[in-house]
Design a protein with these regions (language model features):
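PLP-dependent aminotransferase class I/II
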Residues: 200-280, 284-287
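N-terminal "arm"/small-domain region of PLP-dependent enzymes with the aminotransferase-like
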Residues: 1-56, 143
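Short acidic capping loops at alpha-helix termini that bridge into adjacent secondary structure
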Residues: 76-80, 101-102, 181, 199-200, ...
Length: 355
């Protein structure tokens, strides 16, 4: 600890990302990367990057990318904000609109929310999810506080239907409602069509999960133009060039390839169902998921035992020590071959403990 640290820095509890091992022999089901490589159009765009593009600064407005997103979502480019992953987009959002404000989120959700709340001095209330990990919607209907809600939620995978999002936004008309759709495209209804009617709604997204671009770091927000203008003011007060030319070109190609997105998302849904069916047959409870992962616990075996046993067999999943979910594991949806290998290993683990 340096003597130059501010008290704020000393008191931070930073977010801890999932493990990224160097080995390529592991079956990596712990950080929810897409199971498939990105679209061929993305790889073509990367190959076509020129030295001149790298010599010059990138477009600070990312106009081509924003226009592609706007066309895909039937909104105006003025309603699109882009950043270096949805984490940066959300961080700017907290700074622009939630700093020092009362904010509600869930007690079992994305671990970065309390980090940003502490960083930006927000008064955070963590509303408990219900016994089945569904959202207590009535508890969030509070016009005294903004709401930040992951939908689908992580790590549970559960999602609210659009009509319940409408009810939430309607009941919090004088406070901002942020719907974090990092896991869009895998079955949940999107809140994007609601943006036109609500000046208190922001929808954020990542290309890491849906488009297989976790290594590229691209995210965006959709909201009415006045909110987007506020985000741009904050962005340009930190870094006018958050997205480099390579990221802008590749992300644009990804957004424009709707056929790849639909086919890849269906593949995830198909493998997810195979994993769910196979694990339930072994005595696992598997929560309903609208994401590219499942949240599971066994009816007799402790979560840490399963986690350690999987790791000893070169399969990584995600586990937390938090009391409420310590026996639960979050398992990313992999390829069909990875899913089949997971089921074989899980069967061995369960069988060894029941002999």
């Amino acid at each position: 600890m340096s003597r130059f640290w501010l008290d704020k820095v000393a008191g931070l509890e930073p977010y801890v990302p999932g493990e990224q091992p160097a080995s390529d022999t592991l079956i990596k089901l712990n950080t929810n990367e897409h199971a498939l490589p990105p679209a061929d159009a993305v790889l073509t765009a990367l190959r076509e990057i020129t030295g001149e593009q790298l010599r010059r600064y990138p477009d600070p407005t990312a106009e081509r990318l924003r226009s592609a997103i706007a066309a895909a979502e039937s909104v105006s480019p003025a309603q699109i904000f882009v950043g270096n992953g949805s984490d940066e987009v959300l961080a700017h959002l907290w700074f622009a609109f939630l700093k020092g404000q009362r904010v509600q989120t869930l007690d079992t959700t994305y671990g970065f929310y309390p980090v940003w709340a502490a960083l930006y001095d927000a008064d955070l209330t963590e509303v408990p999810v219900l016994d089945d990990f569904s959202v207590d919607l009535e508890a969030l209907k509070n016009d005294d506080a903004a709401v930040v809600l992951a939908n689908p939620n992580a790590p549970t995978g559960r999602a609210l239907p659009r009509d319940e999002i409408v009810a939430l936004v309607e009941s919090n008309r004088d406070r901002l409602v942020v719907i974090d759709e990092a896991y869009f495209g895998f079955g949940a209804e999107t809140a994007v069509p609601l943006v036109a009617g609500y000046d208190n709604l922001v929808v954020t997204r990542s290309l890491s999960k849906s488009h297989g671009l976790a290594g590229l770091r691209v995210g965006y927000a959709i909201a009415q133009a006045e909110l987007i203008e506020g985000l741009n003011r904050v962005k340009d007060s930190f870094n006018s060039y958050p997205l480099d030319a390579v990221a802008q070109s590749a992300a644009t190609a990804a957004i424009e390839d709707r056929q790849w997105l639909e086919a890849a998302s269906q593949s995830v849904r198909d493998v997810r169902e195979v994993m769910k069916t196979g694990l339930e047959a072994m005595g696992f409870e598997v929560l309903p998921s609208q994401a590219n992962f499942i949240f599971i616990q066994h009816n007799t075996l402790p979560g840490k035992h399963i986690f350690d046993a999987l790791r000893s067999r070169d399969i990584l999943v995600r586990r937390w020590d938090k009391q409420r979910i310590k026996n639960w594991l979050r398992v990313s949806v992999g390829t069909m071959a990875q899913a089949e290998q997971l089921l074989v290993v899980m069967r061995d683990i369960v069988s060894a403990e029941t002999i």
